């Protein structure tokens, strides 16, 4: 790694601290305001310099698209998942949250942004971050993250022989029925906790 100038180190430290405190990178405007730059464009130039030196990666098209390459600690947050790609593929990781995985039992391996209200009756709401322990060993009655033909879903697991039911916790949603002889089902992990609006629950 090339040495950073004093100003570049300030920008890097700000990005790292902002991620540590809020779970997400700052915007260019926030960097400019904190460090007294005249415009977000000045912040962008410093970020590009840091990217050239290999300490960050700039993710195109995202206002908070900054990824630390030196010390990307914490739990990866999985956003939109592309068809045919592993759930934890780099391009699915929106950011990292500075959360101790050991706070969950069993320990969490990643966070998944919940979409929809199918699990609202157990307190899992649209937009929540679901802490997930990566495993394929699950038991009936547990809440799991599953992938069916590239659709990722959070449901309660029930298996009888070759038949699996993925049960919603909302009477407005019907169970998803899977015949393992005819359809692919991948267990991505076990739900071990929920973060709502940055708070534990």
From Swiss-Prot:
The active site is at 118 (for autocatalytic cleavage activity), 155 (for autocatalytic cleavage activity). It is an enzyme of class 3 (hydrolase). SUPFAM superfamilies: LexA/Signal peptidase, Winged helix' DNA-binding domain. One of its GO terms (molecular function) is serine-type endopeptidase activity. GO terms for biological process: DNA repair; DNA replication; negative regulation of DNA-templated transcription; proteolysis; SOS response. The record marks 83-84 as: Cleavage. It holds the Pfam family Peptidase_S24. Gene3D superfamilies: Umud Fragment, subunit A (2.10.109.10), Winged helix-like DNA-binding domain superfamily/Winged helix DNA-binding domain (1.10.10.10). Residues 28-48 bind DNA. It catalyses: Hydrolysis of Ala-|-Gly bond in repressor LexA. Keywords: Autocatalytic cleavage, DNA damage, DNA repair, DNA replication, DNA-binding, Hydrolase, Repressor, SOS response, Transcription, Transcription regulation. Its EC number is 3.4.21.88. Represses a number of genes involved in the response to DNA damage (SOS response), including recA and lexA. In the presence of single-stranded DNA, RecA interacts with LexA causing an autocatalytic cleavage which disrupts the DNA-binding part of LexA, leading to derepression of the SOS regulon and eventually DNA repair. Homodimer. Belongs to the peptidase S24 family. This is LexA repressor. The gene is lexA.
